Amino acid sequence: MAVIKAVDMSEKMQQEAIHAAVQAMEKFTIEKDIAAFIKREFDKKFSPTWHCIVGRNFGSFVTHESRHFIYFYLGTVAFLLFKSG
């Protein structure tokens, strides 16, 4: 189950983000590959340019487009997904 820590995104888009993260975790084990999968899915579905960070320990400070940001956990893995640029 996903635990959302911070969000500025429609409910539909939130569900898509969590779904993409679950799919990525099933397909890949390397965090860079997980992030790349999610980024590409969102670039396709919601037009570029999305950025995705996946990991167990990172800090962040980002600028994002309004209504295009989510930060959540699946287990012990954090996902930061946002659109900028």
UniProtKB/Swiss-Prot annotation:
* UniProt KW keywords: Cytoplasm, Cytoskeleton, Dynein, Microtubule, Motor protein, mRNA transport, Nuclear pore complex, Nucleus, Protein transport, Translocation, Transport
> What is the top-level taxon of the source organism?
Eukaryota
List, alphabetically, the Pfam families matched.
Answer: Dynein_light
Q: What is this protein called?
A: Dynein light chain 1, cytoplasmic
Q: Which SUPFAM superfamilies match?
A: DLC
Q: Name one GO molecular function term.
A: ATP hydrolysis activity
Give the GO cellular component terms, alphabetically: cytoplasmic dynein complex; cytosol; meiotic spindle pole body; microtubule; nuclear periphery; nuclear pore; nucleus
UniProt record, GO biological process? ascospore formation; dynein-driven meiotic oscillatory nuclear movement; mRNA transport; protein transport
Q: Which CDD domains match?
A: DLC-like_DYNLL1_DYNLL2
Q: In this entry, which stretches build a coiled coil?
A: none
The text of the family note is: Belongs to the dynein light chain family.
Origin organism is: Schizosaccharomyces pombe (strain 972 / ATCC 24843)
Q: Which SMART domains does the record match to this protein?
A: Dynein_light (SM01375)
Task performed by this protein: Acts as one of several non-catalytic accessory components of the cytoplasmic dynein complex that are thought to be involved in linking dynein to cargos and to adapter proteins that regulate dynein function. Cytoplasmic dynein 1 acts as a motor for the intracellular retrograde motility of vesicles and organelles along microtubules. May play a role in changing or maintaining the spatial distribution of cytoskeletal structures. Also a component of the nuclear pore complex.
Q: Has the keyword Transferase been applied to this entry?
A: no
Q: How does it assemble?
A: Homodimer. Cytoplasmic dynein consists of two catalytic heavy chains (HCs) and a number of non-catalytic subunits which present intermediate chains (ICs), light intermediate chains (LICs) and light chains (LCs). Component of the nuclear pore complex (NPC). NPC constitutes the exclusive means of nucleocytoplasmic transport. NPCs allow the passive diffusion of ions and small molecules and the active, nuclear transport receptor-mediated bidirectional transport of macromolecules such as proteins, RNAs, ribonucleoparticles (RNPs), and ribosomal subunits across the nuclear envelope.
Its annotated compartments are: Cytoplasm, Cytoskeleton; Nucleus, Nuclear pore complex
